Amino acid sequence: MDLLLLEKTLLGLFAAIIVASIVSKLRGKKFKLPPGPIPVPVFGNWLQVGDDLNHRNLSDYAKKFGEIFLLRMGQRNLVVVSSPELAKEVLHTQGVEFGSRTRNVVFDIFTGKGQDMVFTVYGEHWRKMRRIMTVPFFTNKVVQQYRYGWEEEAARVVEDVKKNPESATNGIVLRRRLQLMMYNNMYRIMFDRRFESEDDPLFVKLKALNGERSRLAQGFEYNYGDFIPILRPFLRGYLRICKEVKERRLQLFKDYFVDERKKFGSTKSMDNNSLKCAIDHILEAQQKGEINEDNVLYIVENINVAAIETTLWSIEWGIAELVNHPEIQKKLRDELETVLGPGVQITEPDTYKLPYLQAVIKETLRLRMAIPLFLPHMNLHDAKLGGYDIPAESKILVNAWFLANNPEHWKKPEEFRPERFLEEESKVEANGNDFRYLPFGVGRRSCPGIILALPILGITIGRLVQNFELLPPPGKSKIDTSEKGGQFSLHILKHSTIVLKPRTF
């Protein structure tokens, strides 16, 4: 940074301290704010809390300050909710008041300042995008249309693993093959396309760009520039890389998928009764003038981020827990053989008549919640919550992981014990019928992908347990399940090697 920029930054910082001090005094008189650590001018609680606002750190603050607390992160108010009652207020009772999304310098780049559905503010654009995306992606009709493809992709995974001699001896990093499976599951729905192998050049390029986007967006290192605008000049290099990755990704989506599908549609007659992939419905909405080309590309962006990776994380967590709990793995295998018969491969309709499989999935989503803090909510106007005043445009985080892992509400929550969902928690479902357990959220901004994720999880985990004994690599009794938290995500730190010994029927 040159001296002129540094001088401007320091002058701006000094001015901001004066302004922040005045504003802080005025707000202190006006609002009854939630409790929290004492902030300092300009930086707020950032110097105390740091950038790493993960679910476990915020759970520790909840134990200290209570079910609702306030962090002043630079010039932003961050309100953290950690009880089922207040989660219900934010997500359901006052769902309209708290239904918007906060702005973020990095996500503004990757979503074109909210031209997508997932990260846009609450309003007419969000309602339109949600409606346009629901029919081609998130209905039972879609499940029934594509479940055969999901079953085929799971069968291909089993076949490829059996062909690999390393899998039964030294072990393999199964995640790599499962990643290809998840891309194929979703790209079949989106574009009626699939990738033949992990070495497919287009798949390699797509995976690399999506991975870079996730790394840039999920990291904590840019928080300081988001919380404290006067420090944003220090983010120039980071934001430039974000813009470059965003442009390359959108161009890839356009050139290789959206435009290719347009060409296919122009040469083939498709009426409303013929089978269409999701992008055909999206392009129809564009032709009607409901959305523009950028919206189309940002819908593709959302599916790449919000559907593929999150489901993959959950599959990976489920497999890791089964490797580390062989008694649970055996119990699940016994259920599959008893209900379906030895060697009878699980299909989507079977998943609903296998209660222990359902319990394993629920427990995976409870202990290893893919989006532990949800995407941040925001109130556009001043609001009330838990007896406190919430200033307009506050960032609201619901610590869904803590709701599902609070020892005051759950018996031995640190244990991976699927039986809890067949015993004391037998009435709890993943659809949000209990505000202690919200793996997909609830209300207006809930994740509509639940209708796809649950059957894919059931088919994939079921097929693997049926066909293989899942073991840690030679010389180890367990695999490492250390967590890696992100801005909103929770995935496994190390993609572990596991041994898959084929079973005979």
Swiss-Prot record:
Q: Which residues cross the membrane?
A: 3-23
Q: Which reaction does it catalyse?
A: (E)-cinnamate + reduced [NADPH--hemoprotein reductase] + O2 = (E)-4-coumarate + oxidized [NADPH--hemoprotein reductase] + H2O + H(+)
Q: Which cofactor does it need?
A: heme
Q: Where does heme bind?
A: 447
Subcellular location, in the record's words?
Membrane
Q: Which GO terms describe its molecular function?
A: heme binding; iron ion binding; trans-cinnamate 4-monooxygenase activity
**InterPro entries registered for this protein in UniProt:** Cyt_P450 (IPR001128), Cyt_P450_CS (IPR017972), Cyt_P450_E_grp-I (IPR002401), Cyt_P450_sf (IPR036396)
Instruction: Please tell me where this protein is predominantly located.
Output: membrane
Pathway listed for it? Phenylpropanoid metabolism; trans-4-coumarate biosynthesis; trans-4-coumarate from trans-cinnamate: step 1/1
Task: Name the UniProt key words of this record, in alphabetical order.
Answer: Heme, Iron, Membrane, Metal-binding, Monooxygenase, Oxidoreductase, Transmembrane, Transmembrane helix
Sorted alphabetically, which Pfam families does this protein's record hold? p450
Q: Name one GO cellular component term.
A: membrane
Q: How does it sit in the membrane?
A: Single-pass membrane protein
GO BP annotations, alphabetical order = lignin metabolic process
EC no.? 1.14.14.91
Residues that hold (E)-cinnamate according to the record? 213-218, 306
Family statement: Belongs to the cytochrome P450 family.
What's the stated role of this polypeptide?
A: Catalyzes the first oxidative step of the phenylpropanoid pathway in higher plants by transforming trans-cinnamate into p-coumarate. The compounds formed by this pathway are essential components for lignification, pollination, and defense against ultraviolet light, predators and pathogens.
Question: What is the protein name for this chain?
Answer: Trans-cinnamate 4-monooxygenase
Q: Which organism is it from?
A: Catharanthus roseus (Madagascar periwinkle)
